[in-house]
Amino acid sequence: MAVHNFDVVVIGSGPAGESAAINAAKHGKRVAIVEKQQAVGGNCTHWGTIPSKALRHQVKQIMQFNTNRMFRDIGEPRWFSFPRVLERSKVTIDQQVEMRTQFYSRNRINLFFGVARFRDEHTLTVRDNQDGVEELCAQQFVIATGSRPYRPADINFRHPRIYCSDTILGLSHTPRTLIIFGAGVIGSEYASIFSGLGVKVDLIDMRERLLSFLDDEISDALSYHLRQNGVLVRHNEDYESIEGDESGVIVKLKSGKRLRADAFLWANGRTGNTDELGLENIGLEPNGRGQLQVDEHYRTMVPHIYAVGDVIGWPSLASAAYDQGRSASDDFLDEDFRFVEDIPTGIYTIPEISSVGKNERELTEAKVPYEVAQAFFKDTARAQITGDTVGMLKILFHRETLEILGIHCFGDQASEILHIGQAIMQQKGEANTLKYFINTTFNYPTMAEAYRVAAQNGLNRVF
């Protein structure tokens, strides 16, 4: 058995693992990265963020073609099958894998493909798909193994019509009807995608409202547009049983309702990928969802073993995972450490949603004297030109100091638009002010000028 010695070994090549490994390598450390799959990128690249967002982009283009009056003048609406749309999305995955493989090569990071398992606190074995075993020894370890869809034992995921958010990307036909259980971020995004392809979707929500962590006005806007696209949202529901047959799937709800569809997608919760790591050999125990507990420096109970990304739970975002990986490596490199917080949320429904900071409910409960600044996309020249007039920018600010407290955006390019306000919101002291948008000249016509419109709207409310 070959034995290799490194300064740092990172388990997992998703956003968290990639940033931890590259940061350590750029500081002169000998770094190895272990990836279970036969290509780098992790769940984010192969089954999660990248394919689903690429798929969403293709569906959005189809929707624009079918609703744009200019295109209707030259032809009838076009119908595309799910597999055909998905095929184009796979091009992006290949590009991502090639690019990230070059990152590791350029930074002289050693890649090992196989299942990683701790032998002791400083030793890791890697078993490849040919049952070959290699041993990696290191002073520091970073666990960045990500997560996978939570699969309840009473649901038969081997049935050809029952899917989770990973296997749905292997769907070989276009269902006429689809039941999605779980109305969180993933469930809402797929409800938008499939309804955009003309599929009738039942979205089952175990809570009272969609994405309750969002500002109420934004959540209500999402509910409205899902309904407009033919999505039936069922709140406060749970399943009694889910059974598939040759022609479809029958879902019995605890409320007594019975639903039937061509296919079923489970999108309710995720589990950390820790079951194959041999954590018992190093004295670590994950929680019931396979997640590891860490301190404010991303250290586990074993001080030289760090954990970052989805494997530690909230917020389970690729953007946060990337920053966590870099911050963890900064800690053992004795560089400036930053705990990752104030994380923006990007939800890629159609239209998309993005937010950062406090929402109205939180500010009201805290008795903060805030005011609302709004700009509607339909009132901006750029949106009128592109035709993407659905949406709004909402800024919450302190009515006395004009400090920006929260930013919420709904509509096309929301996740891009948000970062302008986020940059000002992160400034210290008086630099964080709504007046910045009044005193700044924006390009015209742009969506960015929505900040100026919103700021003027908000200041008109202050007396």
Curated annotation (Swiss-Prot):
One of its GO terms (molecular function) is dihydrolipoyl dehydrogenase (NADH) activity. The keyword Oxidoreductase applies. FAD binds at residues 35-44. It holds the Pfam family Pyr_redox_dim. Its EC number is 1.6.1.1. It catalyses: NAD(+) + NADPH = NADH + NADP(+). Its cofactor is FAD. It is found in: Cytoplasm. Binds 1 FAD per subunit. One of its GO terms (cellular component) is cytosol. GO terms for biological process: 2-oxoglutarate metabolic process; NADP metabolic process. PANTHER family: DISULFIDE OXIDOREDUCTASE (PTHR22912), SOLUBLE PYRIDINE NUCLEOTIDE TRANSHYDROGENASE (PTHR22912:SF93). Belongs to the class-I pyridine nucleotide-disulfide oxidoreductase family. Conversion of NADPH, generated by peripheral catabolic pathways, to NADH, which can enter the respiratory chain for energy generation. This is Soluble pyridine nucleotide transhydrogenase. It comes from Chromohalobacter salexigens (strain ATCC BAA-138 / DSM 3043 / CIP 106854 / NCIMB 13768 / 1H11). The gene is sthA.
